[in-house]
UniProtKB/Swiss-Prot annotation:
HAMAP family for the chain: PurH
Keyword Transferase annotated: yes
MGS-like domain mapped to chain residues: 8-158
GO cellular component, one term: cytosol
Species, as recorded: Sinorhizobium fredii (strain NBRC 101917 / NGR234)
The protein's name: Bifunctional purine biosynthesis protein PurH
MF term (GO), any: phosphoribosylaminoimidazolecarboxamide formyltransferase activity
Family: Belongs to the PurH family.
Alphabetized PROSITE patterns for the sequence: MGS
């Protein structure tokens, strides 16, 4: 709903005479205070900020001079006083407010520079419960909200990144309404995000997956040229979660990531993280959030080649994710193909030099792999609401696989089944994945019927075989995975026609017996996982 009027009755220009400074992040605060003092502004401060300013030789009053009350309870109570909040909330041209200020000796505060206890940082670092609670700021948010509400007369600054803009604004000693309003909006967003972090931390501490109120906060990391399509606006907000991935990775080279780049890179890195680097190098190639090819191999270079072989046509302009450090040999292979993004836990210096030959290629170092078993939440907006669920961190290695056919899978078939099911978990439903010897042979994604996904995957495999001069597609003797149950035997029969000899699926269809009978008729081994992996 649009706001009827975007302004309240207020003077456009307000002269800054008294400033209250209370910050945990002291970056730039001495320089700001010195500039304010140079303009004749009275400085008032609290605790550690007061000490820092006094140590810098600046004339600064302690907040107790405004309140007539000392800081008590280890600093828990120092600004929660009418002497402070009256100075922030008073309507300057209201006669009753002015009379109350005079009667109680309240000094008007024109500028508040405040940032908060580092709760988010302490939480991210895994602080214990008492330490984290102690870093919940009370007085800071109260002063910020009071100042922002009274932005008609008070300027609130909560971000050190805005100090230069503040100094530019007060070049003549005043701030204008538009600036105060902008800073007020930013201030309320800051306190909302802060409270969201606290609320979510308590929910985690109490193991409340779905609390009565769920607040999601984020900080704008970058404003994008456009969204999924050029006519859509977009921005990338980060939540502070320290899960290795596109939000925390370092961009070593290349252009700014687009909306689609970020979405696809996240999908690619989460997929490749299913494969533990200590077991084998792995590579996943993604296009439009679906894998084109996934493979493991004795070397990273070979894993890349095998992943590419699955569907080299679709891989053009794709995203490459690796589960180990990008080395020079693999980099030399990758630069042969147009690629949008590479993401890896780390990148060798030699590989960086090779990738630098493609200056537009975005290269990300994530600093590690996300733990596929770590719990967390995912969210999706719908009209009028927010769908929130726990992350799909079910792992096929943790499942008790049930052999439902007369023939049990061979050891190799079982390995291929598990590999295919891992990949199918990351393919848009309906998903069918053929795999053989640690390599995807064909991937069918996002079809409305499962049999069509099975057919498309087989067609992809045949095309790949022709492109690479193979006598037969890799689906011959492969295992096939379906991320949800096979509702009819037709999908299974399509996979058998493509050459699959083993099937892995959740099971649970009303026609399971029909599907099992078809598998037995063709001497195909089939196992049920009991776990579905829909992905939309």
């Amino acid at each position: 709903m649009a706001v009827a009027s975007k302004k309240i009755p207020a003077p456009d220009e307000v002269r800054i005479q008294t400033a209250l400074l209370s910050v945990s992040d002291k970056a730039g605060i001495v320089e700001l205070a010195r500039a304010l003092h140079g303009k004749g502004v009275r400085l008032v401060s609290t605790g550690g900020t007061h000490k820092a300013l006094a140590a810098a030789g600046l004339p600064v009053s302690d907040v107790s001079e405004l309140t007539g009350f000392p800081e008590v309870m280890d600093g828990r109570v120092k600004t929660l006083h009418p002497g402070v909040h009256g100075g922030l909330l008073a309507i300057r041209d209201d006669a009753d407010h002015k009379a109350a200020m005079d009667e109680h000796g309240i000094t008007g505060i024109d500028l508040a520079v405040i940032n908060l206890y580092p709760f988010e940082e302490v939480r991210a670092q895994g602080g214990d419960y008492p330490t984290t609670v102690e870093n919940i700021d009370i007085g800071g948010p109260a002063m910020i909200r009071a100042s922002a509400k009274n932005h008609a007369y008070v300027t609130i600054v909560t971000d050190p990144a805005d100090y230069s803009a503040l100094l530019e604004e007060i070049a003549d000693g005043t701030t204008r309404y538009a600036f105060r309003q902008k800073m007020a909006a930013k201030a309320y967003a800051r306190t909302a995000a802060y409270d969201a972090a606290i609320s979510n931390w308590f929910a985690e501490a109490l193991d409340l997956a779905m609390p009565r109120h769920r607040v999601i906060g984020g900080v704008l990391k970058e404003e994008m040229r456009y969204g999924e399509n050029p006519h859509q606006k977009a921005g990338f907000y980060v939540t502070g979660e320290q899960r290795p991935g596109v939000a925390t990775a370092a961009l070593l080279q290349g252009k700014q990531l687009s909306y689609n780049n970020i979405n696809d890179t996240d999908a690619a890195f989460e997929l490749v993280a299913e494969f533990l680097p200590e077991k084998a190098p792995a590579c996943a190639i993604i296009k439009h959030a679906n894998p084109c090819g996934v493979a493991t191999a004795p070397s990273l270079t070979e894993a890349y080649r095998r992943a590419l072989a699955c569907d080299s046509t679709s891989a053009f302009g794709g995203i490459i994710a690796l589960n180990q450090e990008l080395d020079a040999e693999t980099a030399e292979e990758i630069v042969k193909l147009f690629t949008e993004v590479i993401i890896a836990p780390s990148v060798s210096d030699e590989a960086k030099a090779i990738i630098a030959r493609k200056p537009n290629l975005r290269l990300l170092a994530a600093g590690g792999l996300p733990d596929a078993r770590t719990p967390g939440l995912t969210a999706k907006t719908v009209a009028g609401g927010l769908l929130v669920q726990t992350r799909d961190n079910g792992m096929v290695e943790d499942l008790e696989l049930k052999v439902v056919t007369k023939r049990a899978p061979t050891a190799q078939e079982l390995e291929d089944m598990k590999f295919a099911f891992k990949v199918a978990k990351h393919v848009k439903s309906n998903a069918v994945v053929y795999a053989k010897d640690g390599q995807t042979a064909g991937i069918g994604a996002g079809q409305m019927s499962r049999v069509d996904s099975a057919r498309i995957a087989a067609i992809k495999a045949e095309e790949a075989a022709r492109a690479h001069g193979l006598a037969a597609p890799l689906t011959r003797g492969s295992a096939v995975a379906s991320e949800a149950f096979l509702p009819f035997a037709d999908g299974l029969l399509s996979a058998i026609a493509a050459g699959a000899t083993a099937v892995i699926q959740p099971g649970g269809s009303m026609r399971d017996e029909e599907v099992i009978a078809a598998a037995n008729e063709h001497n195909v081994a089939m196992v049920f996982t009991g776990m579905r992996h829909f992905r939309h």
